[in-house]
Amino acid sequence: MKLLFIVNPISGDIDKEPFLEEAKELCSFYGINFLVFKTTGKQDTLKLNKILDDFKPDRVASVGGDGTTLFTAISLLHENIPMGIIPLGSANGMATELYVHPEPIQALKDILLSQMIYGLDLL
């Protein structure tokens, strides 16, 4: 499995590095090929599109809050790649509404292990 983490380093004013370190250990332990893309606010869409073309992930994990979730969903709109949410923003409203586990590492385990994939309507 190839997993792409899309990380907003400043969402919710929460340090993402402790989560990323634990996530890297988990992925390495299970032999999951992963890549971390950190948003900067400068040409993120262009950079992400290139990564999607080059890396060709099997799944994407959106790491941040609602804004990161929206950015990730829009970026994957015309792709056939399942997306999961790692709730590391300030309110995590979308993650809460979608019953995503509130603990980031457990949410990652759900993304990695779940075979239940659902479509969502985007307006």
Show which residues each predicted segment covers.
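Catalytic core of DAGKc-family lipid kinases
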Residues: 4-6, 30, 78-82, 86-123
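Gly/Ser/Thr-rich beta-alpha loop segments that engage phosphate groups in nucleotides
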Residues: 14, 66-67, 89-93
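Conserved functional loop/turn residues at catalytic and ligand-binding sites
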Residues: 56, 64, 80
